[in-house]
Amino acid sequence: MSERNGMNYIEILLVEDNQGDVVLTKRALKSGKVLHNLHVANDGEAALAFLHDVEYGQAPRPDLILLDLNLPKVNGREVLAKIKSNEALASIPVVVLTTSKADEDILKTYQMHANSFITKPVDWPQFMNVVRLIEEYWFTVVKLPLHEG
């Protein structure tokens, strides 16, 4: 969480290569109730670079990561593995938000300690609703641990 103009902002990292989904996610979050800063990484390599900067105080620590699985350069499973194996990052909630409906993907990501697995709806209003529900759940229902920095 960061502060700007005396207000607390939630830091969200969206790891998504589909620009249409990036735009829809931005719109859904903008229409939500939570003040936020959205950081976008368009591939797994960019996500890992952002998280490297977080470790060294050069980028804000995300309060939530929305992670696609099918990413160029470094796939989402590899990104998830790096996050959850890093003591400094492991407590950040990771929501896998992907087009996959495969039971194998669901099982594997939970075994890798993803906090949620959500299949992206193809319908625009449903997609918007899913993003708003993610926001509501993670920032109004759930109590997250405090972190330093």
Where are these regions (language model features)?
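Acidic, metal-coordinating helix/loop segments flanking the phosphotransfer/catalytic sites
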Residues: 4-5, 26, 40-64
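Conserved acidic carboxylate
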Residues: 16
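Hydrophobic residue at a beta-alpha junction
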Residues: 71-74, 83, 92
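C-terminal output helix
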Residues: 46, 122-134, 142-147
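Two-component/phosphorelay signaling modules centered on CheY-like receiver
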Residues: 19-44
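Active-site residues of response regulator receiver
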Residues: 68, 98
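Short, glycine/charged-rich "phosphate-handling" switch motifs in NTP-dependent
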Residues: 115
